[in-house]
Design a protein with these regions (language model features):
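A structural signal for the principal folded core domain
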Residues: 1-224
């Protein structure tokens, strides 16, 4: 079988587990995809590392502070010429997707497209959190979902370094398994769950993650 034709590079790891017997965790779909969106944005700005170090990093921190994330900051990575940044929780990531003005830092059409990717992903994710999802809504989600992933990896048009070249967005290699699942399989899961009178948002590890966070915090509290 040619798995490439099915949108897969390799055979399924667990072919014995049918699609109807498992559900992706909606929390980690959001967390890991926002990690990709933020990473693509920050690393593009780090292409001019001197300018990033001199002013851009501070401006981004100020923008984060403007939307209420006053603890956000960049710090030098162990990888030379790179910076890491403060880890954000789910609520904070949703705040960034909704309110951070990407176009302040990436000008022109590219900045608008990048901001669209953030806002549209937020809209699609919030759809998954709705109580009542209709068949029509799932169909609309599926079309918008596929359009979103295609815009993410929109190719460069025109000859390299030519005046008419239109720079694309990100590489297909930047697409992660979570993004593949989001774009290619979530509508299928929505239909399966709807037929069973279940909701996608109920399949979330958010409560477990919160409990784990509290346990870790308590351990660290008594460590010092």
């Amino acid at each position: 079988m040619n798995y490439i034709l099915l949108g897969h590079a390799n055979q399924c790891l667990f072919p014995m587990i049918k699609t109807g017997n498992w559900v992706p965790d909606e929390l980690h779909i959001m967390l890991r995809i926002t990690d990709v969106l933020f990473g693509c944005f920050f690393y593009q700005l780090m292409e001019d590392i001197n300018q990033f170090r001199k002013s851009i990093s501070t401006l981004i921190e100020q923008e984060m502070h403007r939307i209420g994330l006053t603890h956000f900051q960049f710090y030098e990575s162990k990888t030379k010429g790179k910076y890491d940044w403060t880890t954000l929780n789910g609520t904070e990531k949703l705040n960034v997707l909704k309110n951070f003005e990407v176009s302040k830092f990436v000008s022109g059409e590219r900045g608008k497209k990048m901001e669209f990717l953030w806002r549209e992903f937020l809209r699609l994710y919030l759809f998954l959190r709705q109580d009542n999802i209709t068949d029509e809504g799932i169909d609309l989600f599926e079309r918008a979902d596929k359009t979103w992933i295609l815009k993410f990896c929109e190719p460069t048009i025109g000859k390299s370094n030519s005046a008419n070249q239109k720079r694309g967005m990100f590489n297909p290699t930047d697409i992660t398994p979570y993004m593949h699942t989001f774009a290619c399989h979530i509508p299928q899961f929505l239909r399966i769950l709807k037929n069973k009178n279940l909701q996608f948002k109920h399949f979330s590890t958010s409560s477990l993650e919160k409990k784990n966070h509290l346990h870790v915090s308590n351990v660290l509290l008594y460590t010092f």
